Structures are given as C-alpha cells and as structure tokens.
Amino acid sequence: VFIFDVHSTYQTDEVFPGYSYHENAEDFAMLWDTYEDVAPHSIVHELTFFVKEEDGSFSRHDEVHEERTYEVLTYDILLEQAGFKSFKLYADFEDKEPTETSTRWFFVAQK
C-alpha cells in the first residue's frame, strides 16, 4: 500500500493564486504570499518570518516554496507505470470522493 496526498488542480489554479496570509505577534511575524507560476497547475509561495531574538532584535528568514500538481489521470498513469494495480481517491481529509472544488487529494494505491 502506498498512501500520499497532493494539492488538487482546483487548489493550485483557483485558491492559491493571490493568496495572502499575515500573522503578527509580539515575538514573531509571518508574511505568506502565493503567486501563480509558469507551468500548468504550479504556484510559488514566498514566506518571510521575523523572529524576536534574546537581545530584543528581530532576525529575518525568507523561504520560497515551488509546488506543482497534475490531473488525476496523470497520477493514475504514473502509478500504473510504477506497478500499482489500483488506487482509491479521497478528498479534503475525509472519507469522501473528490468534487470539483476539493482542495486536497489523497491516494491509496495497491500493488
């Protein structure tokens, strides 16, 4: 059994582009902005963290995360090429089938 999860194409194409989340606390701040990337179903997350140090100053930490997902058919083909005979597909952290607006897909593949 091989179990994995990925963002859905709805998540990368409709939800993430333009997504912005900012959090500000006394000892910590985070900026998270997401942009559409060039490849189909791909996005770039730009994250900036400000962490308060013991001396009261703040240090800055930047991260860039690039993510891409594919259509379910592509995962089906790749799983078959890897020797898997079948898979079940679930969505959004629940025991349910995906819908058009599901944001996360969970694959349970069998050899």
Where are the model-predicted features located?
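SAM-dependent methyltransferase
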Residues: I3, H7-T74
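C-terminal lobe and adjacent flexible extensions of AdoMet/dcAdoMet transferase-like proteins
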Residues: E66-K111
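A contiguous, well-structured "functional interface" segment within a domain
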Residues: V1-F4, F87
